[in-house]
């Protein structure tokens, strides 16, 4: 079982203000395959504030630079595609091949 205990807010993994967790279930077995932080209104407000603060800078970034940044994100997702695909397949009950 995977245990994630932080939220990604403002470019960093941070401990959530909220103390609860959410169980992620396998669609086929209903077993708990992961636990993720539930967060609360303070966590949501921090995420929204970070997004608002970043918006003007992102909007002013030249399109070529934004494209390069998105290409790096794509590389990271491709590098983890097997892990991500397996998690999605378990959670929604689809074949791994379709989830990757």
Give the predicted meaning of each segment.
Residues 1-36, 68, 72:
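Terminal low-complexity tails and localization/encapsulation signals of metabolic enzymes
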Residues 33-100:
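Glycine-rich loop-to-alpha-helix module at the N-terminal edge of alpha/beta enzyme cores
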């Amino acid at each position: 079982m995977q245990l994630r205990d932080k939220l990604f807010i403002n470019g960093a993994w941070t401990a959530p203000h909220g103390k609860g967790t959410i169980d992620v279930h396998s669609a086929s077995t209903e077993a708990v395959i992961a636990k993720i932080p539930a967060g609360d209104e303070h966590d949501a407000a921090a995420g929204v504030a970070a997004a608002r603060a970043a918006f003007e800078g992102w909007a002013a970034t030249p399109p070529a630079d934004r494209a390069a940044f998105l290409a790096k994100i794509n590389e990271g997702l491709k590098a983890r595609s097997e892990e991500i695909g397996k998690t999605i397949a378990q959670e929604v009950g689809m074949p791994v091949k379709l989830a990757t």
